[in-house]
Amino acid sequence: MLRLAPTVRLLQAPLRGWAVPKAHITAKPAKTPTSPKEQAIGLSVTFLSFLLPAGWVLYHLDNYKKSSAA
């Protein structure tokens, strides 16, 4: 544990000089509320954009295995 302290200090030294700007977050309601239809479309597009490429790769995994074995 004693050897870990200098290593941690060495890794923290560059981070001390960085100034992170404060985020401007407000708690006001939205100017234009999002309808349930818009929310459903947005969630569907988001999930499909992640799931379709992953499903395509998994479906063609055998082809990848066969082509790399040559």
Curated annotation (Swiss-Prot):
Pathway: Energy metabolism; oxidative phosphorylation. InterPro entries: Cyt_c_oxidase_su8, Cyt_c_oxidase_su8_sf. It is a single-pass membrane protein. Residues 60-70 are mitochondrial intermembrane. One of its GO terms (biological process) is mitochondrial electron transport, cytochrome c to oxygen. Residues 1-24 form a transit peptide. GO terms for cellular component: mitochondrial inner membrane; mitochondrion; respiratory chain complex IV. It is found in: Mitochondrion inner membrane. Keywords: Membrane, Mitochondrion, Mitochondrion inner membrane, Transit peptide, Transmembrane, Transmembrane helix. The chain crosses the membrane at residues 36-59. Residues 25-35 are mitochondrial matrix. Belongs to the cytochrome c oxidase VIII family. Component of the cytochrome c oxidase, the last enzyme in the mitochondrial electron transport chain which drives oxidative phosphorylation. The respiratory chain contains 3 multisubunit complexes succinate dehydrogenase (complex II, CII), ubiquinol-cytochrome c oxidoreductase (cytochrome b-c1 complex, complex III, CIII) and cytochrome c oxidase (complex IV, CIV), that cooperate to transfer electrons derived from NADH and succinate to molecular oxygen, creating an electrochemical gradient over the inner membrane that drives transmembrane transport and the ATP synthase. Component of the cytochrome c oxidase (complex IV, CIV), a multisubunit enzyme composed of 14 subunits. The complex is composed of a catalytic core of 3 subunits MT-CO1, MT-CO2 and MT-CO3, encoded in the mitochondrial DNA, and 11 supernumerary subunits COX4I1 (or COX4I2), COX5A, COX5B, COX6A2 (or COX6A1), COX6B1 (or COX6B2), COX6C, COX7A1 (or COX7A2), COX7B, COX7C, COX8B and NDUFA4, which are encoded in the nuclear genome. This is Cytochrome c oxidase subunit 8B, mitochondrial.
